[in-house]
């Protein structure tokens, strides 16, 4: 099987005509997408960064008096 089977919308069908899965289970959720661990890591870093900005802002001027 040299070429990929694709539907009219460009997606790979779930099953081949003989009933076997069209894509191996190892690549089922990662083909053409970002790995979930990478998205989660970037999201976690972004959350920590935003919280850091809020904490920094909340302590700006504390003790300055005036």
From Swiss-Prot:
Classification via InterPro entries: PSII_PsbJ, PSII_PsbJ_sf
One Pfam entry name: PsbJ
Gene3D superfamilies attached to this UniProt entry: 6.10.250.2070
GO biological process, one term: photosynthesis
Transmembrane segments: 36-56
Annotated keywords: Membrane, Photosynthesis, Photosystem II, Reaction center, Thylakoid, Transmembrane, Transmembrane helix
Entry-linked SUPFAM superfamilies: Photosystem II reaction center protein J, PsbJ
Domain of life, source organism: Bacteria
Record GO cellular component, one term: photosystem II reaction center
Assembly mode: PSII is composed of 1 copy each of membrane proteins PsbA, PsbB, PsbC, PsbD, PsbE, PsbF, PsbH, PsbI, PsbJ, PsbK, PsbL, PsbM, PsbT, PsbX, PsbY, Psb30/Ycf12, peripheral proteins PsbO, CyanoQ (PsbQ), PsbU, PsbV and a large number of cofactors. It forms dimeric complexes.
Role according to the record: One of the components of the core complex of photosystem II (PSII). PSII is a light-driven water:plastoquinone oxidoreductase that uses light energy to abstract electrons from H(2)O, generating O(2) and a proton gradient subsequently used for ATP formation. It consists of a core antenna complex that captures photons, and an electron transfer chain that converts photonic excitation into a charge separation.
UniProt name for this protein: Photosystem II reaction center protein J
Organism: Prochlorococcus marinus (strain MIT 9215)
Gene label: psbJ
